[in-house]
Each structure stands twice: as C-alpha cells, then as structure tokens.
Amino acid sequence: MHTMTPLLKKQQAGEKLVMLTAYDYPSAKLAEAGHVDLLLVGDSLGNVILGYDSTIAVTVDDMVHHAKAVRRGAPATFMVVDMPFASYHGSFDRTLEAAARIFQESGADALKLEGAGDILTTIRRLTEAGMPCVAHLGLTPQSVGVLEGFKVQGKSLAAAEQLIADSLAAEQAGAKMLVLECVPHPLAKRVQELLTIPVIGIGAGADVAGQVLVYHDILTYGVGRLPKFVKAYADWNTSGTEAIARYVEDVKNGTFPELAHSFLMDEELIGALYGGFKE
C-alpha cells in the first residue's frame, strides 16, 4: 500500500500532481511508464470501456475487476478507486462492506466518493475504519440527473459559497484529497487556498494542486467530441482506424502474412505430410 506522504511532499515543494484514469492492465502500464503521480480507476469505465450511457450501471464487481487489473499494471503508483453509484448510500454497514471489498481485493490506496452532506460523514467513518478517502465535489457525474446535465457548478455566489463550505467540511471529515470538477477557475483557486489537502482539478483551472483527465480523452481513443477542459495529446481514433484498415487490406489482397510471419518445417516432414510426395 502506498501512502500520501510522497504526494504531499511534492505539493509542498510546489510540484503539480498528475492524475490519470486507468481501467485495465495496458493503460496502467503506459500511465506508470509515463510517470503519472496517481491513477484513478474511475466509474467512468462505464462510459469508455463498457459502453453505458452513464456511470449509474457500474457495480462494485466492475470496479473490483478493473482495479485489480490496474494494480497489476501499475504496482508502484498510488491508486484511487471510485465507489460506484448507490454503493455508499443507505446503511453504513452496507457501505462498509462494499468499501472493504474494493479496498481489500483491488489493492486500492484510497477510495473516492462523490458529494457532500451525509457523504462526508461516510468519509469520516471510512477513514476511521482505516480506508483513506478522496472527496469529489462540483460536477458529480453520479448525480448528473439531479444537477440537470453536465454543467459548470458554483457559478452563483450562493453556489460558490456552498462549494467552499463543502470543501472545508470534506477536509475536516478526513478526506486526503479533493477532486473538483467543472467549476470556475477563480473558485477552484480559492478552494485550494483555503485547504491544506491537495485539490485535483478537472475543468477547474490551473491554480490547484494537480490535474486529472480521462485516459481515453487525452489519447482520443474510442471517444467522440471532447469536453472543453480536455487537451488531446494523440489521435488514436485516426491512427488506430487506419492501422486496422491496412490490416484488413493486407489480408484481403494476400500480402499478409508474409514468409517472415510464418513458421517453417523440415522438407522431409513436409513430404511426409503429402504421403512422401510433394508436388
């Protein structure tokens, strides 16, 4: 298990923290090779891996399955795992069972929970039970129906003040980090100024401790239109489609496989296959 200490030292030294989502073994290996500071096994896997319209259908089983693969691919990187929709609502006993399963079976270093209010009490109790937690405020995708779509949060004074209050309460509840999603840059900056824990932004501007983006978004891999806050660093949609098309063409026209891609046999054995006669 990894601790927050190296990450906090980087924050204190003024070094930005870099978080990236990962959902399987190869994405985790690439992320660790690229020297990201943290990995997030997000319930966004429901969208980008499983093809769901939202994260609502993602289960604890899904999170455990994918997080175990990520841990195998990136054993040296701090890994945060989302608690999926409805797994931390209702009785605390049920929440504890789900959290403990994810934590134990996946090798998670921290669990991420969306929302404020009663969720902060859950964060406090899980922390007391020995499971570090990350809070997630602003746009919370599991509650997007209540929030009336994917919209910037905290745009009014009242909403901004509530977000600040919730952020302070999250730190007081024991959250080790705070993810702020889709909030105005100046508001995110003010939140980071008021907190001692790292604020990791996604669509929250540059004046926070670090940034998180989705693996498939920065690589333009299997995704469509990108959100405003995403910067693409590759175009795997185009390069991947072109590569597959070339493979199809080579097989169809007989140029693949070539002799270099094939395994040979001794001529006598070949003759034996043809009853001793090779035409």
Curated annotation (Swiss-Prot):
Swiss-Prot/TrEMBL GO biological process terms: pantothenate biosynthetic process
Family: Belongs to the PanB family.
Gene3D superfamilies assigned to the protein according to its UniProt record, in alphabetical order: Phosphoenolpyruvate-binding domains
Catalytically driven reaction(s): 3-methyl-2-oxobutanoate + (6R)-5,10-methylene-5,6,7,8-tetrahydrofolate + H2O = 2-dehydropantoate + (6S)-5,6,7,8-tetrahydrofolate
Annotated pathway: Cofactor biosynthesis; (R)-pantothenate biosynthesis; (R)-pantoate from 3-methyl-2-oxobutanoate: step 1/2
Gene that encodes it: panB
EC number in record: 2.1.2.11
Name of the protein in its database record: 3-methyl-2-oxobutanoate hydroxymethyltransferase
Localization in the cell: Cytoplasm
Assembly: Homodecamer; pentamer of dimers.
